[in-house]
Design a protein with these regions (language model features):
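Short His-Asn-centered micro-motif
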Residues: 91-94, 189, 229-232, 286-288
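Charge-rich, low-complexity N-terminal segments
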Residues: 1-62
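Cysteine/selenocysteine-centered motifs that mediate thiol-based redox chemistry or coordinate metal-sulfur cofactors
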Residues: 150-180
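Alpha-helical substrate-recognition element adjacent to the catalytic core
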Residues: 182-264
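Short, solvent-exposed loop/turn segments at secondary-structure junctions
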Residues: 96, 194-195, 233-235, 289-292, ...
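C-terminal cap/substrate-recognition subdomain and adjoining C-terminal extension
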Residues: 240-339
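Conserved, surface-exposed functional patches that form binding/active-site neighborhoods
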Residues: 90-137, 295-296
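Phosphate/ribose-recognition catalytic cores of enzymes acting on nucleotide-derived substrates
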Residues: 57-99, 107-112
């Protein structure tokens, strides 16, 4: 069996896009939900459906909603187009659900899959892999028959009334997005040594073009809020230039950490901001650590990306920042259900 993380990093590379997961307990659904928001990327298509023909499955503006119902043996992923309609479903027969060390949901794939489209296509995939697993002794006869039975249940439950399937997926997507809107991804941003190489003899610092491109890519890719922690936030000519830079790159959700004599370090300022905004749970700190290395607060330090002040913000810093932003809140790191 293969472990599949719902950040979809194994095959699709979605770990560098916004990812959310949560429990849903409502009349129509009980279980886990996960959302991948695709904020960039060229479109990818599946073109093997008899009725639907060529359908988009990934690309800028799309999103994937994955639902794992309690007590069942499958994971259903609805691939939503930018207009809010579903292009296709990919449903995995699964063995178990687990949570990785970074808190991200995953499942153990039991090979057999079902694919659906709104045009009425129903495709059963990878049965030969299931057969091979049975012949090799990986699965017992009971496990093999259970996988086949679950595949048929998937067709009966999700494939018979595709309109109803799309409606419930849309309803769950709306629910998930409402929760996501209350959980902003946040970038605490230093300026000197991050977006520029500080030159003390210069009245106005010059933004490094590559660093500017990198911070804009991070903010747009992760749909993140910016909270400036630099002393430049106190105002002045350079601050006005920074605001113009962000505005010119369509970045408008900008805030600053509190300041005053009562704060003795950036650590205290960031903690004060987090206290004022308890809905912020997922955040990253981009800092060259010239003023504060955050050693007095190990929790904050876990969210730190140390930026080399002689280079400014680099691509590898952005990659690490995405990984930190997609960490999930600590929960039991065990199998949730073994089915």
């Amino acid at each position: 069996m293969t472990k599949k993380r719902l950040t979809r990093d194994l095959k699709w590379g979605f770990q560098y896009f916004p990812y959310y997961q949560m429990r849903i307990e409502c009349e129509k659904f009980h279980g886990w939900a996960a959302l991948n928001e695709l904020t960039d990327g060229e479109y990818m298509y599946w073109d093997f459906f008899e009725k639907a023909g060529r359908v988009p499955v990934a690309g800028k503006g799309m999103c994937w909603l994955t639902l794992i119902p309690d007590g069942r043996k499958h994971s259903i992923t609805a691939m939503f187009m930018e207009d809010g309609n579903v292009s296709a479903w990919y449903i995995d027969v699964i063995h178990s659900v687990l949570i990785d060390e970074d808190g991200v949901l995953a499942f153990m794939d039991k090979y057999l899959d079902v694919m659906l489209t709104t045009s009425g296509d129903v495709l059963v995939e990878d049965k030969e892999e299931l057969d091979a697993a049975y012949r090799s002794g990986e699965f017992t006869e009971e496990q093999y028959e259970a996988a086949l039975l679950e595949g048929q249940r998937i067709i009966d439950e999700w494939g018979k009334d595709i309109h109803a399937t799309e409606l419930i997926c849309k309803e769950m997507l709306n629910y998930v997005k409402a929760q996501v809107n209350n959980q902003p991804l946040t970038v605490f941003l230093d300026i000197d040594g991050v977006l520029n190489i500080y030159q003390p003899d210069s009245e106005v610092q010059t933004l490094l073009p590559c660093a500017g491109e990198n911070i804009c890519e991070l903010i747009h890719r992760m749909k993140a809020k910016v909270v400036v922690i630099s002393s430049h936030r106190l105002g002045g000519r350079y601050w006005d230039m920074l605001l113009d830079f962000f505005k010119g790159n369509h970045i408008y959700d900008i805030d600053i950490t509190p300041y005053g004599e009562e704060y003795h370090s950036r650590t205290e300022e960031i903690n004060a901001y987090l206290h004022m905004h308890p809905n912020i749970e997922r955040y990253v700190i981009l800092d060259d650590c010239f003023q504060d290395d955050y050693s007095c607060d190990l929790k904050l330090r876990e969210h730190l990306v140390f930026v080399d002040a002689l280079k400014g913000l680099q691509k590898q810093d952005i990659i690490k920042a995405c990984e930190i932003l997609n960490r999930q809140a600590p929960v039991c790191r065990a199998v949730i259900h073994d089915v």
